Every structure is written in C-alpha cells, then in structure tokens.
C-alpha cells in the first residue's frame, strides 16, 4: 500500500477539481483571441508550427516570403505571449516599427501595447547600435525578457 502525504492528497484533489475548468491554449485561441479569427488558415498553420518548434527547441524564426502575413502571425504570437504573462521584446526595422508594428499593436492589441504598464517593448533594430545608456538598457532588457 502506498502512503500519501496530506499535501499530495490536497494537490491531487485540487488538480481533479480544476481539471475541466482549465482553459487550454486552443480553447483560448478559438474563443477569446483577438488575432486568431483574423488569420487565414495558412497563417494559423504557421503560428501553430512556430509554437511547436519554439516549445521543442526553445525558439523559432518566422521566415516567410513577402505578403504572406508575417506581421499578423507575429501579432498572434505577441497576443499569446501576453496572455501567458511573458515579457516580450520586439525588434523591427525602423520603417516597419513606425509604419506597421506600432499602429497595428495600437489598433488590434491595445491592452498589450500600453504606455504606462506593459509586458511588451518594441524597438527599432537600429536602436541596437545606439550609444550612451542603450547598451546597459538592452542588457537589462535581455535579462528580463522571456521572448525576443
């Protein structure tokens, strides 16, 4: 006969109690995500592939051709990471940051792209070459970031 500690019994009871109440990522995507319904099927497949690769290898790159919706797949990933309370850092070319990413984040994911409190930081890739306080700032950001 196996002996269980009171903690083991308590944790098992809680796990059983909340087993059907815990929302999986797929349920969230289908029912609550802002971005998921906007994606075309091939973009959803790209998103799922990225998540699968990132979980397996600790990271992934989205390298699709022009016009295939990398921005929207990226927004979906940012939304999911925000839901998971991850600290996300996004680097984009300056023109894409100002002309695409900042406006799309404000439009589609305003709760994640806050100015006062946010787990999302967006930079131009040229910021990486800046001097002064920037190298130390990026060092701190790299220590805090869960996703870059």
Where are these regions (language model features)?
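ATP-dependent helicase/translocase motor core
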Residues: 1-65, 72-81, 148
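SF2 helicase/translocase NTPase motor core
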Residues: 23-37, 41, 71-73, 82-148
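Short, charged/polar low-complexity linear motifs in solvent-exposed/disordered segments
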Residues: 65-66, 87
């Amino acid at each position: 006969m196996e002996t269980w500690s009171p903690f083991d019994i308590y944790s098992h009871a809680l796990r059983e109690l909340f087993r059907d109440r815990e929302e999986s990522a797929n349920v969230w995507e289908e029912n609550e995500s802002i971005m998921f319904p906007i994606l075309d099927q091939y973009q959803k497949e790209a998103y799922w592939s990225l998540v699968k690769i990132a979980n397996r290898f600790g990271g992934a790159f989205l390298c699709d051709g022009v016009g295939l919706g990398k921005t929207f797949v990226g927004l979906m990933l940012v939304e999911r990471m925000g839901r998971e309370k991850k600290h996300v850092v996004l680097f984009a070319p300056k023109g894409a940051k100002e002309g695409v990413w900042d406006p799309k984040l404000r439009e589609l994911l305003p709760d994640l792209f806050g100015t006062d409190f946010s787990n999302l930081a967006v930079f131009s890739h040229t910021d990486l070459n800046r001097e002064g306080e920037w190298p130390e700032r990026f060092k701190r950001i790299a220590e805090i970031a869960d996703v870059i």
